[in-house]
Design a protein with these regions (language model features):
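Acidic, His- and aromatic-enriched active-site or binding-groove loops in soluble protein domains
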Residues: 1-8, 95-101
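Loop/helix patches that line or flank the sugar-binding groove of alpha-linked glycan CAZymes
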Residues: 16-19, 26-38, 43-156
Length: 156
């Protein structure tokens, strides 16, 4: 599902590709973990992916509402982490290292000198995090989304 959503977010594929991908995972979908970012993939906000974090919001909403599968939010994703720092062995590649003793600016801003209250986030990061919060709270609190299933209208 990740590859399909990435292509759609980057305007290289139509949204109609989702139906085929969804059908392709029919037999294994109950074992799937959905994600838009992880340590192997480039950050949505990076120059190597979409260039802006907001571009991933529709993908997050879709994944979170697709079925009852868990959705992974990767370290700083909800803050719009760009992954464009030259850290350790990684270099500037749109990813964030899991191997180096290094910290991301977005996480430091969230940690706010140990208060862990987001006190140093900028307005854009706060608004972006709020979008994530709204979507994830809706999915967890709305019974039809939290426990429901769906049937695609384009299913064939």
């Amino acid at each position: 599902m990740y590859d399909t959503l990435r292509e759609i977010i980057c305007h290289r594929a139509p949204t109609t590709d989702i139906s085929a991908r969804w059908q392709a995972i029919e037999e294994t979908k109950e074992h799937m973990l959905f994600f838009l970012e992880n340590h192997d993939e480039q950050r949505i906000a990076s120059d190597f992916f979409a260039g802006k974090a907001q571009a991933g919001i529709p993908g997050l909403a879709f994944m979170a509402m697709l079925d009852v599968n868990p959705v992974m939010i990767y370290n700083g994703q909800e803050l719009g982490e760009k992954g464009m720092d030259n850290e350790g062995f990684s270099g500037v590649d749109g990813r964030t290292s899991i191997f180096d003793y290094w910290s991301m600016q977005s996480i430091r801003a969230w940690a706010n000198n140990g208060l862990v209250d987001g006190g140093q986030l900028n307005d854009e990061q706060r608004a972006f995090r709020e979008s994530y919060k709204k979507i994830l709270n809706l999915v967890n609190n709305e019974k039809a989304l939290a426990r429901g299933h769906f049937y695609g209208l384009a299913y064939c």
